[in-house]
Amino acid sequence: MHRRAAIQESDDEEDETYNDVVPESPSSCEDSKISKPTPKKRRNVEKRVVSVPIADVEGSKSRGEVYPPSDSWAWRKYGQKPIKGSPYPRGYYRCSSSKGCPARKQVERSRVDPSKLMITYACDHNHPFPSSSANTKSHHRSSVVLKTAKKEEEYEEEEEELTVTAAEEPPAGLDLSHVDSPLLLGGCYSEIGEFGWFYDASISSSSGSSNFLDVTLERGFSVGQEEDESLFGDLGDLPDCASVFRRGTVATEEQHRRCDFGAIPFCDSSR
């Protein structure tokens, strides 16, 4: 028994000396540090809710999609999703006036009163308010474009009226008392007075065609004789041998005359 007690005491002393020499492992210290989670701090974002009647919103559509009212900031829509418990979706917008601006807003219809829009603003703009000169310039440009478009339409209407009146009114100096109604010639209405010379010529030709032909033939023969005299006036008389040609020409002329006189009673008999 005495020996067993001495052995146990020696073992206890060795254990104590080992614990004093060997330090604690570093892994146990790291585990103790990792096991303690550090709480993350969430930054508090101030939100501001504004309700606007849909009747006052410009650009509202009847199909259900509603655009938010203009608040002098430039916004760009980057998403939309349905809301649980509401038949209306929610639109997400971010500020596009300046690159990197954290300002955001959410637009949706109110569940209680669907005739109103609920606009929730989050974060503040990190850039100055857009100058009013830019807004006035854009407004001025739009107004100038509208004015020029209206002026062009008015000019076109005036030109159309002028063309219509010019087509309807006859030219000055024409006597159209004998005309009953206009005729459609070449796709547009024109009075007979413009072609009065043609109308008169047709009437005169139908009534006295024989007189007209006689006058033209006489003028033609007289002109031909004058030209022959002017051309052959310097030539002398032909010799006696040329009488043969003269007799031949006289004979042919007599034959033509006989044929003409013989054709007249033949035409009368056919009638």
Swiss-Prot record:
Subcellular location(s) of the protein: Nucleus
Keyword Cytoplasm attached: no
Signal peptide boundaries: none
One GO location term (cellular component): nucleus
For this entry, the protein name equals: Probable WRKY transcription factor 69
Give the disulfide map: none
Q: Name one Pfam family in it.
A: WRKY
What the protein does comes down to:
Transcription factor. Interacts specifically with the W box (5'-(T)TGAC[CT]-3'), a frequently occurring elicitor-responsive cis-acting element.
- Region Disordered, as annotated, extends over 1-47, 130-166
| Predominant cellular place of this UniProt entry's protein | nucleus
What InterPro entries does the record tag this protein with? WRKY_dom, WRKY_dom_sf, WRKY_plant
In alphabetical order, the GO MF annotations are: DNA-binding transcription factor activity; transcription cis-regulatory region binding
- Name its species: Arabidopsis thaliana
Q: Which UniProt keywords apply?
A: DNA-binding, Nucleus, Transcription, Transcription regulation
Report which superkingdom the organism of origin falls in.
Answer: Eukaryota
Family of the protein in this entry: Belongs to the WRKY group II-e family.
Question: What are the DNA-binding region positions?
Answer: 64-130
Q: Where is the composition biased (Acidic residues)?
A: 9-18
Q: Which SMART domains match?
A: WRKY
